Amino acid sequence: MKRITTFGDSIMGGIVLDQQNGQSAPRYTLLEESFSSRCASALGVEIKNHGRFGSTTRHGLRELDRWREQVTASDFVVTEFGGNDCDHCWKQIASDPEGEHRPIISLAHFKEQYRQMITTIRQLGSRPVMLSLPPIIADRYFDAFTRSMNSEQRGNVLRWLDNSVENITQWHEMYNLQLFKLSALLDVPIIDITTPFLVERNYREMFCDDGIHPNERGHRLIADTICHAATGYI
């Protein structure tokens, strides 16, 4: 049986928004039928999943070091990072909309830290495989992270976004594009899980209300995409 170790953020970890939660603060839960679980069953492989809520490439480097022996024993290591790296500290923007604000992990550091992860995986004797990022639903995400803000703070964030919540996607798209560039530069296979969403007319229905986490339907789509692509690797 092939062994696969995965590292990434909450999407890799199978975290979804608890849609039954009636509280103002969002609560998250682990999806039993996540794409990782579905892939393990469909492909007949063992998957050790180290996806973590809020993880960036900086965390990924630490996790790789922590699980070195497991990586060495794995046939493949699958990585999925970028969604948190490209995010912003929206509370700071709400307090100072005229200030200079950058993504949590700069694009330069994102590129370098991802490159270091790939190098480490190879040095430990495993084969890296990258995942691209699912798209985001900008208006839902804006509503989610401004829910606890007052009207002035919400207005400040919107003003910083040049009065268009769709501008949130520009960083996400930029970091996602960088993944494909890194794949080509480092000669690492990448599985495109972006396009399968975008070709669906109703892909918004495949995301939780927070606009960033795929729901069960979304995880099913990701699993189908990976399993189809994996026939070339496994």
Predicted feature residues:
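Secondary-structure junction/capping motif
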Residues: 19-38, 56, 106, 132, ...
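Alpha-helical cap/lid subdomain in secreted, periplasmic
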Residues: 63-234
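Structural motif
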Residues: 55-64
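Glycine-centered flexibility sites
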Residues: 8, 14-16, 51-54, 82, ...
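Intrinsically disordered/low-complexity terminal segments and short unstructured peptides
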Residues: 4-5, 55, 119, 224
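Serine-esterase "nucleophile elbow" of acetyl-processing enzymes
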Residues: 1-51, 65-73, 77
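Short N-terminal helix/helix-N-cap motif within the alpha/beta-hydrolase-1
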Residues: 15-16, 58, 88
